[in-house]
């Protein structure tokens, strides 16, 4: 029973735990009972209660067990119910896309996947029934929906709903001359380095020109930029030149200023002007303005008391903006904000477009579905375009932001016929390799070049680099384009993320971040002294150091005195202050004096004497007292007399104790030392640490005891440790002594009164990431990189990358790819274990080939084979068999086949018929590569007058075409714009004239809309005519009447003279008079044809009353209206050859330009038109010019006195404007304010011309404006004066003025234009702006203020002797003319001035605001072609110089007009004038209106017959603003008139 009950125990425990876990609320009640049961079970078997049986003990346990079994059964039932409930809930719903879905619900996560909720589980699968969900096919490969793949290393594509979307690399735009794509890269980079004067220079390097040491050049992004070295004026009398240097130097000495002495080379800031820095150079003080670093693009103005602008705000467009404040943006699609001196712009947010390829519409910011943007190109909606992808040709259409494409056949490359007969397609051979027509490739030996095959000629050009998105990119060796992986700053390369100090400005700390260097001024620590100092080359001021005993100590440092360690010193304000150290109190009363303090308790100082520890000595004043030294304390006691053995002791005078008459024996000592007396204490010689006593000749000794030392490191004295010094690590040190720690490196220890204290040596933080430790402190004079030390400027292999080469430079380590020698082959192989390519194999377009291996060309695998020869792939076409036909077409591999025909560059299918060669009038047919042709048969025409047009085979009937409407031969009609005129078509010629009325009745009636009076009723001569009938009313066969039915009322007669057709081109000898009963004359030969060559021309037919013009391949002849005459009919006559009658006064003069011209007098209107007065009428003739074709580097030009143009080299322009600013031929902007006469531009080689300007200060000192211009042409002198007055050889002339063949001067708008024979043009506005244009044939031959015109702006400051001058003022003064053409007057030389500084801050601010219009929308279209910044600076300069008032408006307009003139030259015409801004008044009463860029050759009465296109082509004058006639009117004698009232103009030949 006990065993069974024992077996129940584990079950009881298990059930109890289940019950307790299930019923948390009954734990407190059941747990004691269960514990009782367990404790009872585990208790000993004997009963502790007398008389209690085992049955009585187990009964409670069995009852509890039954209760637990019932509870467990109940728990199991509840558990089963819960599990069933969970299963039921799971089968009722699913978790869908972000929410629960009921049973049976269906949803689509994407366009090609469908999901269904079944039994609580989401079952998802593809939808193959949809066509676009079955995947994609690309280049013969199949891809599933959503699959991403890369057809090549630079393209990533994705299959989405049956459409393949591919995206190429995003390459930044480059700005260098040569670029290339490195192997394995997708984007081009700039080729590093520059070539200048026959030498190669590394990218970022700075160097002096070898031919001119006064030019400082730099190589940046493969371009060389040079600026003149500015030599400061030498402060000494005899400067010494140095070989190879530009500027002479003085011999060394110091400077004295007031009470201050400066050393040579020392710099300081002058008090009161923080921007002025002075320097002592060779005994002379030179001061200059501080150059502020450009820390941000738009810094705020300097704080009061400081010099340089700060980056805590922005100064933009003349306004101050705090950081974080919004600023205006020129791009309406961007929002800009000022951020710490920079302007950051973000595009405005755009809503998502409901189409896949939305496009951009001009004027809108966000893409919309009205167009398409596909593969980087914009297309209009419904526009169709073609693409070529991977050899396939696609035809695509844009529809509301969606692009759909379908494949089509690609056009066959045209082939040419060879001399031997078969047709061959052109190919290109470059460096022994053959390339097919139209293919593009990169030469392997020129990685930065892209080539293409065009018509059999290889065309190669440098790869253009995209602009990098950083300011200081680095161009790695071997790369074409710069990258932003590191920074090149001041010719040094820094790694990304590297902090460094600017080598040129040590007060700046810089940081390289993604190719852009951001610099900020070093924050100097606060100084505690009153007068901090700046040393040479020192950035931050610091307190002066102290010098004591020839040793230097920094400010604030505490240190022991070099010669007296008992003194502690400190450095303050450059002075060393010292005092005795504070001594610790001694732990004894009578210490010995130590090295510095009296606290040595190893002995006693008592009564003016020193005693060792333990010594007994008599009291200095009481001999009967005996004293003892005990660790610095003295104990004195009365002597105790020993008991005597004798009965009668004797007291000797001077002794304290009586003695027996027989004295005890002394104690002898070794050597010759004095014996020790009885009862005397002494120390044994050589053992000062033992104390002995002599007793009647016997010696007893005992060791002295030492007290504990009150310090940590006492030194050992003769017997006991002493705190007067230190014993540390086996070495003794004096108190106050400093020494290096023997245990810990770079720690310094101090011994003070027996204790040693060690602390780390203080070091300044290193300013580099890889410093080395020298003398315990980090130093940047070398590098500690990955545990290895390297010297500065040392190159070493990268321990982490075998193919990298690292350079240590001042504690910074920069690692780049190890440069490789260029391989001697074109397709080297890159082996993984080698850093550089090798020629022991070939790598050709991603395919590796062994030496001698032949394989198909990857670019043309079907038709070309390539062989690897010593690292270079040699590719050639497979040979083609000859074709057995005469006109084969290109087949596979461009081999000729006879399946179709190639004729005239086009392919024709077999059996196809086509037109023969142009002009052959043949019809051809293609049969198996053979072409047979037959001549066309023209159909017969029903008309007599036929014409065969050039380029056509068959003739056509010469009908008439007027205003786009065809009129048949012999027809007549009324023009819509002239109801009283009548036109007729006769033999292809249209003749129009006013209806000439004839009266057929006595009382004709004329209505308001009638052209001629009508006769009511259709009755004439007693006969009545029906509507539509016509008859001849009299004997004149030219008169005819027609009966016409009116809308209302009876019919009426309309009578007029017949209109005769114009006989254009009929010679007078061939004219036939009209026969009987005929009205019009005829011509015995064919009339003239209006061909394309004659379109726009005018001819005078035999009838002088008509003028004929060739339009739409049809002669249009109109009848001339004759003016009414005031003389009676009998005084009128018609001159032979003229149309209109004139009064019989052959001497009648003509009115021309406000003056009377005698009859018969002739004059020239311009170079192309001459006029004469004939009997009171002006007759003019105009010369016509042939079309002129100039080469690319030439432009049409006009010679003085010549009508027709000639080709001259393309010109360059130089301008002087404003106060005055000079923009040279090479584009440099100069400021020079001399008020004398100067050479502006001159032919310094051939002496062809010389242009001088005379400046005037207009009453303001230090500034000037151009007053007049003088042009010298050989012996002829022309002066262009104020108000557009012109003098030639001291005589005032009227414009236009011609002196053949040298000179022609004219007035266009408000601008005087001078044309001279060498191709020179001078434009003068009559106030202060002058422009000189010379052809490029004068390149490198000019001199003067306009520069030398050599294409290099940096050397424009050359004086007459050819030397570069340091300042613009000295340059301008060197070109002073000794005596001008005008009257002599006093003048002043130019000097360097800053009118804004003199005018003050308010004037500068107002000038900035007014000149800000240059950067606003009226000029925005010009900003891309002509940068506005130089003109903005010139405008501010001028407004400060002009001062307030009305003169400032003129100065502003001069600057704005100068910029607008440059814009017009670049092809952009800004519309910038307003009602209150630079208004130009025009004589409105004479019909003129202002035009910013009107036609330079306006329409006049003398050129109105010339077509507009021909007139514009032959007008080479510059576009100038001025007053023009509006459309529909022509200019004549200073008025705008209708063309109909112009005098007659007769056309002549060339």
Curated annotation (Swiss-Prot):
It holds the Pfam family VWC. Residues 1-21 form the signal peptide. CDD domains: TIL (cd19941). Glycans are attached at residue 340. Residues 31-53 are annotated as: Disordered. Residues 60-92 form a coiled coil. GO terms for cellular component: extracellular space. Weakly expressed in embryonic kidney and brain. Not expressed in adult tissues and several cell lines. Residues 1212-1388 form the VWFD domain. Disulfide bonds join 1214-1346, 1236-1387. The keyword Disulfide bond applies. This is Kielin/chordin-like protein. It comes from Mus musculus.
């Amino acid at each position: 029973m006990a065993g069974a009950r024992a077996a129940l125990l584990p079950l009881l425990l298990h059930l109890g735990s289940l019950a307790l876990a299930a019923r948390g609320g009954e734990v407190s009640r059941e747990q004691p009972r269960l514990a009782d049961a367990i404790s009872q079970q585990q208790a000993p078997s004997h009963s502790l209660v007398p008389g209690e049986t085992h049955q009585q003990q187990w009964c409670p346990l069995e009852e509890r067990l039954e209760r637990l079994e019932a509870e467990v059964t109940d728990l199991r039932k509840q558990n089963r119910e819960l599990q069933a409930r969970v299963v039921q809930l799971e089968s009722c719903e699913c978790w869908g896309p972000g929410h629960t879905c009921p049973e049976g619900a269906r949803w689509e996560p994407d366009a090609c996947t469908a999901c269904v909720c079944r039994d609580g589980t989401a079952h998802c699968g593809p939808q193959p029934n949809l066509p676009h969900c079955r995947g994609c096919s690309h280049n013969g490969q199949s891809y599933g929906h959503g699959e991403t793949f890369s057809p090549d290393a630079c393209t990533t594509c994705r299959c989405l709903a049956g459409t393949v979307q591919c995206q190429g690399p995003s390459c930044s735009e480059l700005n260098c001359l040569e670029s290339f794509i490195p192997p394995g890269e997708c984007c081009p980079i700039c080729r590093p380095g520059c070539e200048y004067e026959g030498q190669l220079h590394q990218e970022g390097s700075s160097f002096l020109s070898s031919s001119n040491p006064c030019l400082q050049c730099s190589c940046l992004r493969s371009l060389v930029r040079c600026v003149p070295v500015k030599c400061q004026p030498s402060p000494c009398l005899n400067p010494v030149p140095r070989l190879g240097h530009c500027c002479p130097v003085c011999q060394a000495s110091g400077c004295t200023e007031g009470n201050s002495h400066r050393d040579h080379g020392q710099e300081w800031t002058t008090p009161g002007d923080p921007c002025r820095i002075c320097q002592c150079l060779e005994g002379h003080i030179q001061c200059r303005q501080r150059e502020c670093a450009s820390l941000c693009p738009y810094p705020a103005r300097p704080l009061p008391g400081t010099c340089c602008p700060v980056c805590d705000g922005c100064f933009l467009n003349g306004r101050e903006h705090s950081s974080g404040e919004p600023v205006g943006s020129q791009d309406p699609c961007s929002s800009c904000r000022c951020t710490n001196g920079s302007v950051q712009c973000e595009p405005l947010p755009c809503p998502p477009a409901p189409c896949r390829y939305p496009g951009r519409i001009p004027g809108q910011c966000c893409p919309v579905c009205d167009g398409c943007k596909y593969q980087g190109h914009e297309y209009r909606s419904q526009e169709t375009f073609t693409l070529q992808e991977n050899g396939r040709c696609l035809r695509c259409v844009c529809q509301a932001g969606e692009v759909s494409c379908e494949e089509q056949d690609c056009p066959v490359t045209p082939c040419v016929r060879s001399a031997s007969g078969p047709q061959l397609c052109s190919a290109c051979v470059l460096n022994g390799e053959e390339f097919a027509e139209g293919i593009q490739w990169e030469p392997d030996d020129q990685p930065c070049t892209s080539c293409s095959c065009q018509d059999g000629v290889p065309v190669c050009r440098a790869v253009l680099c995209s602009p990098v998105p950083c300011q200081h990119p680095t161009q790695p060796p071997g790369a074409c384009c710069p990258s932003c992986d590191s920074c090149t700053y001041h010719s040094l390369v820094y790694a990304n993320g590297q902090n460094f100090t600017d080598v040129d400005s040590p007060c700046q700390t810089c940081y390289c971040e993604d190719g852009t260097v951001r610099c900020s001024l070093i924050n100097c620590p606060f100084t505690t002294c009153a007068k901090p100092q700046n040393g040479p080359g020192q950035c931050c001021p610091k307190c002066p150091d102290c010098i004591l005993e020839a040793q230097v100590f920094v400010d604030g440092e505490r240190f022991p005195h070099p010669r007296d360690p008992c003194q502690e010193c400190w450095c303050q304000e450059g002075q060393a202050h010292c005092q005795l150290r504070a001594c610790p109190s001694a732990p004894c009363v009578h210490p010995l004096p130590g090295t510095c303090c009296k606290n040595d308790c190893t002995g006693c100082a008592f009564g003016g004497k020193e005693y060792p520890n333990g010594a007994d000595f008599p009291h200095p004043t009481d001999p009967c007292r005996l004293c003892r030294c005990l660790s610095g304390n003295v104990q004195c006691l009365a002597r105790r007399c020993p008991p005597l053995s004798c009965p009668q002791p004797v007291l000797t005078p001077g002794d304290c104790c009586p003695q027996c008459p027989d004295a005890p024996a002394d104690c002898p000592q070794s050597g010759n030392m004095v014996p020790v007396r009885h009862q005397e204490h002494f120390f044994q010689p050589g053992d000062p640490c033992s104390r002995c006593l002599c007793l009647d000749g016997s010696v007893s000794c005992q060791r002295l005891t030492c007290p504990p030392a009150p310090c940590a490191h006492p030194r050992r004295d003769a017997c006991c440790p002493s705190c007067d010094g230190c014993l540390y690590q086996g070495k003794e040190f004096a108190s106050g002594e400093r020494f290096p720690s023997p245990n810990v490196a770079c720690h310094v220890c101090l011994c003070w009164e027996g204790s040693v204290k060690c602390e780390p040596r203080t070091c300044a933080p290193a300013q580099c990431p890889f410093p080395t430790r020298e003398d315990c402190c980090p130093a940047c004079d070398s590098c500690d990189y990955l545990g290895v030390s390297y010297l500065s400027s040392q190159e070493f292999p990268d321990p982490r990358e075998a193919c990298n080469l690292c350079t240590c430079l001042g504690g910074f380590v920069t690692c780049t790819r190890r440069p490789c020698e260029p391989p001697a082959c074109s397709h080297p192989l890159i082996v993984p274990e080698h850093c550089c390519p090798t020629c022991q194999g070939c790598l050709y377009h991603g395919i590796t080939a062994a030496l001698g291996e032949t394989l198909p060309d990857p670019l043309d695998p079907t038709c070309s084979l390539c062989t690897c020869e010593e690292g270079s792939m040699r590719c050639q076409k497979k040979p083609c068999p000859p074709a057995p036909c005469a006109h084969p077409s290109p087949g596979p591999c461009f081999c000729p086949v006879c399946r179709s025909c190639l004729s005239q560059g086009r392919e024709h299918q077999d059996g196809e018929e086509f037109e023969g060669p142009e002009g052959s009038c043949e019809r051809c047919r293609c049969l198996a590569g053979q072409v047979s042709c037959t001549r066309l048969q023209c159909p017969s025409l029903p008309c007599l007058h036929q014409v065969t047009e050039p380029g056509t085979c068959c003739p056509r009937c010469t009908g008439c075409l007027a205003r786009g409407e065809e009129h048949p031969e012999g027809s007549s009609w009324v023009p819509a714009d002239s109801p009283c005129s009548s036109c007729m078509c006769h033999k292809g010629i249209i003749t129009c004239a006013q209806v000439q009325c004839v009266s057929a009745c006595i009382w004709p009636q004329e209505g308001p809309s009638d052209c001629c009076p009508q006769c009511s009723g259709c009755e004439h001569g007693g006969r009545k005519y029906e509507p539509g009938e016509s008859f001849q009313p009299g004997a004149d066969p030219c008169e005819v009447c027609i009966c016409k039915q009116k809308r209302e009322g009876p019919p009426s007669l309309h009578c007029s003279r017949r209109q005769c057709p114009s006989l254009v081109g009929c010679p007078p000898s061939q004219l036939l008079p009209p026969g009987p009963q005929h009205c019009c004359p005829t011509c015995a030969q064919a009339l003239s044809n209006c061909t394309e060559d004659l379109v726009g021309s005018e001819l005078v037919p035999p009838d002088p009353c008509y003028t004929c013009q060739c339009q739409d391949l049809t002669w249009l002849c109109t009848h001339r209206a004759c003016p009414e005459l005031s003389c009676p009919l009998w005084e009128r006559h018609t001159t032979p050859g003229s149309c209109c009658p004139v009064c019989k006064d052959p001497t009648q003069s003509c009115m021309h330009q406000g003056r009377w011209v005698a009859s018969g007098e002739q004059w020239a209107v311009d170079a192309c038109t001459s006029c004469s007065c004939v009997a009171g009428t002006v007759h003019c003739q105009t010369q016509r010019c042939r079309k002129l074709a100039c080469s690319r580097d030439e432009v049409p030009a006009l010679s003085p006195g010549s009508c027709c143009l000639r080709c001259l080299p393309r010109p360059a322009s130089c301008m002087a404007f404003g106060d005055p600013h000079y923009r040279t031929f090479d584009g440099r902007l100069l400021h020079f304010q001399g008020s004398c006469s100067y050479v502006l531009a001159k032919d310094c080689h051939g002496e062809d011309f010389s242009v001088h300007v005379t400046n005037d200060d207009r009453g303001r000192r230090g500034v000037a404006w151009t007053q007049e211009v003088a042009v010298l042409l050989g012996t002829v002198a022309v002066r262009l004066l104020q108000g557009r007055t012109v003098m030639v050889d001291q005589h005032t002339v009227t414009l236009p003025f011609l002196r053949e063949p040298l000179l022609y001067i004219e007035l266009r708008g408000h601008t005087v234009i001078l044309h001279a024979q060498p191709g020179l043009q001078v434009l003068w506005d009559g106030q202060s702006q002058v422009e000189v244009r010379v052809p490029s044939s004068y390149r490198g031959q000019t001199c003067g203020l306009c520069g030398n015109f050599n294409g290099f702006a940096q050397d424009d400051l050359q004086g007459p002797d050819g030397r570069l001058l340091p300042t613009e003022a000295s340059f301008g003064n060197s070109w002073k003319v000794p005596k001008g053409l005008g009257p002599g007057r006093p003048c002043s030389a130019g000097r360097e001035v800053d009118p804004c500084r003199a005018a003050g801050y308010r004037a500068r601010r107002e000038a900035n605001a007014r000149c800000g219009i240059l950067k606003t929308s009226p000029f925005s279209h010009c900003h891309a072609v002509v940068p506005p910044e130089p003109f903005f600076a010139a405008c501010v300069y001028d407004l400060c110089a002009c001062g307030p008032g009305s003169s400032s408006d003129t100065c502003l307009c001069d600057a704005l007009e100068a910029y607008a003139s440059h814009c017009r030259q670049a092809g952009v015409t800004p519309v910038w004038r307003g009602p209150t801004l630079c208004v130009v008044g025009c004589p409105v009463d004479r019909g003129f209106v202002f035009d910013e860029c009107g036609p330079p050759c306006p329409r006049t009465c003398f050129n109105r017959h010339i077509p507009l296109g021909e007139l514009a082509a032959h007008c080479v004058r510059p576009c100038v603003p001025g007053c023009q006639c509006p459309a529909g009117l022509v200019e004549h004698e200073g008025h705008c008139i209708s063309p109909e009232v112009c005098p007659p103009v007769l056309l002549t030949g060339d």
